[in-house]
Amino acid sequence: MDTHIWVWSLLEPGRLSRRVSKALADPANEVWTSPISVWEILVLRQKGRLILQPDAMAWVSAALLRVPLKEATLTHEVAMATAQVALRHQDPADRFLAASAKVYGLTLVTSDRNLLAGKGFSVLANR
């Protein structure tokens, strides 16, 4: 799932569509996250764009334990796949999330228009 979807699912679940909420809650679905999302959360906190209590590291550690998540490990294959996903912009975090979805055969849950318009990986729109 995209970083903002993970954060919203924990802090602002009302921002998720019914379809996305249902998909995330369905025990038949595996929910995956990427280390890139952890990095992105920490960067957003450093820039003051995200407030986390008691602090960012503690929040991320607790968030990783709160719901069962599988880790989409960053591998050489994922790094190479960043060149195979078609995105309108060059945001490295988005490229790694899209490439992870491609390599692991996952559906990337997002509200990001750039990712929704991308090609080479599966998406579920939060609408």
Functional labels for PLM-detected ranges:
Residues 1-33, 47-62, 66, 104, ...:
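Short, well-structured N-terminal submotif of metal-dependent ribonuclease cores
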